[in-house]
């Protein structure tokens, strides 16, 4: 599979699991591995993050029925999690640093979230921090509405309860 080299396309920031640099579109992705070197990494740790970046880079080819005519985008991908278990506190700290050091990016994708439903009476701490980061940095987060792990889950999970984010499912 071949796609043209990037030229003047805008860059979207991705904060997710790891990225596999061996994929056909890797020329379009500037990858930063933020996971501690002492944490073991398995091949499965690269699957989700790579899939997210693939849709941003080559979505029209991978999902032609969803082609919106916007074309391809370059990606600056920050791998912040390996494995299914990660600390939301640690991820939020990393997000703050990543945003502060990448002021040129205005649109950020975050597909990491909880499979547990949000509380009916207040927004999550993670969502509140994302809202604060967006307001302070004039950016927008595109946040996954959370995958539905089973039929009993009806509501979104954190941080998809962010008020200022664009939430997609």
Give the predicted meaning of each segment.
Residues 2-32, 39-88, 138, 162-165:
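Subtilisin-like serine protease catalytic core
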Residues 23-29, 35-37, 118-122, 152-154:
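A short acidic (Asp/Glu
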Residues 81-165:
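Substrate-binding/access-modulating region of protease and related hydrolase catalytic domains
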Residues 1, 36, 111-112:
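A generic structural motif
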């Amino acid at each position: 599979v071949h796609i043209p080299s990037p030229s003047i396309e805008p860059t979207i920031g991705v904060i997710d699991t790891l990225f596999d640099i061996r994929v056909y579109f890797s020329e379009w992705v500037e990858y930063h591995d933020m996971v501690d070197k002492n944490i073991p990494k398995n091949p499965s740790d690269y699957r989700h993050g790579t899939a997210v970046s693939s849709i941003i880079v080559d979505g029209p080819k991978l999902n032609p029925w969803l082609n919106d005519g916007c074309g391809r985008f370059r990606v600056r991908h920050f791998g912040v999690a390996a494995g299914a278990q990660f600390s939301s506190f640690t991820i939020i700290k990393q997000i703050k640093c990543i945003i502060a050091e990448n002021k040129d990016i205005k649109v950020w994708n975050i597909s990491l979230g909880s499979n547990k439903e949000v509380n009916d009476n207040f927004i999550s701490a993670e969502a509140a921090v994302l809202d604060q980061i967006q307001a302070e940095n004039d950016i927008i987060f595109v946040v996954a509405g959370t995958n539905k792990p089973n039929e009993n889950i009806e509501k979104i999970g954190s941080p998809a309860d962010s008020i200022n984010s664009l939430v997609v499912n």
